[in-house]
Amino acid sequence: MFDVALSTMWGIGQFESLADFFAAGAALGFTRFELNHAVNSAMLDGLNLNGWRITSIHEPCPADIPMSALKNQNWLISAPDEDNRQRGVAAVRRSIDLAGKLGAQVVVVHPGRVDIDTDLETALVDLYKQGRPDEPVYAQAKERLAAARMSQAEINMRSVRRSLMELAEYAARLGIRLGLENRYHYHEIPLPDELDDLLNLGCGDVVGYWHDVGHAQALENMGFGTHEEWLRRFGSRIIGVHLHDIVGLHDHLAAGLGRIDWDMVARYLPADALRTCEFQLFNSSQELAAGVNWLVEKGCVTRR
């Protein structure tokens, strides 16, 4: 048994039911689980946890409005349009309600995005995948992306601040904490200075930082800061962590299959932070088991 949860990311599309997923996880030594944003109400109907513990809910869950639809409609907590923003807040509230119902401690929150032309980021990613990050054309594309983001960021951040204050008040009434997750894409919120802003809104311990190791490494690989900066600046505010590995920009590998500096990660993780293995379903059960053992060896996870 381990002090780490297994995300349903590894189960959706692989098992017929959540019960089957929990059973498979238990066979691998898991007693804790995170429900992610691919779990809808139909999957939850009649669910018997049978003693399994849900430690965290990754919004939007239940995903009756899929994440893709929320993004396409800009129904996000960062939306400048008030109706869209309220729809985004409502989606997170549904996840808070579910956390309260299931006894989860934390809702993992995506704080939205900066509304810019995402083709700017796609162009940069394409150059990276072509092996051209040291060429002038990459630096130029990166500069265009950063400038576009900077010109728009405060407009979206105003909406995020307002949304977060509302959500923190709602979550506090249910005894739920909100973990603001660092994101994979550069145009998404937050960057480190934005996270510092959001963690100091006056929401107290209700709002903390949820560190995603693969996302931080992806941004470093693209040339946007360092992975360690997130941990150094916000290590004391970490309430949870998504553990997965990455090669280049290909993330959600089982730990040990990529290039994450796990010794560095382990140095910063608070003992009481929730830990979740967020491995994609392309990882075999053998790779998953080996990944957890790797995390134990590196000091990121404890065997109980």
Model-derived regions: residue spans:
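Glycine-rich, proline-tolerant flexible connector loops at the mouths of alpha/beta enzymes
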Residues: 36-56, 117-118
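N-terminal small/glycine-rich loop or linker at the start of catalytic domains
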Residues: 1-9, 56, 63-77, 137-144
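Short loop/turn segments at strand-loop or loop-helix junctions that form parts
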Residues: 58-62, 109-114, 244-245
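Active-site acidic/histidine proton-transfer and metal-coordination neighborhood
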Residues: 77-208
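Conserved beta-strand edge residues that scaffold enzyme active sites
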Residues: 39-40, 61, 113-114, 185, ...
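Short, hydrophobic beta-strand segments that form beta-sheet elements in well-ordered domains
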Residues: 6, 29-37
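Generic detector of well-ordered alpha-helical packing
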Residues: 35, 59, 182-183, 213, ...
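Histidine-acidic metal/acid-base catalytic patches
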Residues: 1-4, 8, 12-26, 41, ...
